[in-house]
Amino acid sequence: MQNEEKYNFIKYYEHSFRNNWASEAVTDYGTNVTLTYGDLATKIAKLHILFEQCGIKKDDKIAVMGKNNSNWVSVYLATVTYGAIVVPILQDFKANDAIHIVNHSESKLLFISDINWEGIELDQIPDILAVFSLNDWHPISLTLDPERISMSAIVDVFNSRYPNGYTAEEVHYAERSNDQIASINYTSGTTGFSKGVIMPLNGLAGNIR
């Protein structure tokens, strides 16, 4: 690893995926579902294509709400390594709080568990281009061309882009310095709606040095 990359948060993950491709990365609690670093990197690559198809750009916000599992991890890491800003929403928040956070953060995409979507309507979150299920990735609601962002369309683009398969050598993520924003975290406030706290990449990098 080059000196300038030594403490870069995104480079941490880029190098970790490359160097630990066959090792176990995450397991869904209470199941036998375990993803290797290679499996996780592949899911991230497909999510990056989905972001592209949705027109997501650097510093756009992507919200994620649901219990911690491998899909939640995939969205979080895919967002940060794409160069976008992740907005994690506590799964215990009520629908009104989630709506406020999505709107206040100006998120463009929302990944949410099916149970957390109950009580939310697309017209309540007007800046959102598409909502995807964290359970199985199906589009719950969208304003975009469904043929461009269906899972089958994403797989077709993925297979065309990586005709020989996705390998460790293919892992290349966004170039972002640690002083740029990684996430906006909304805490459960004691009065009124929750407030957002900006977390730079350096704040996350400091936890894994």
Regions from the PLM with identified roles:
Residues Q2-V26, T42:
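A short N-terminal helical cap/helix-turn-helix that marks the beginning
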Residues A25-G55, D60-N69, V73, L77, ...:
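Conserved AMP-binding/adenylate-forming core of the ANL superfamily
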Residues A45-I49, N103-E106, I115, G192, ...:
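Solvent-exposed alpha-helix faces
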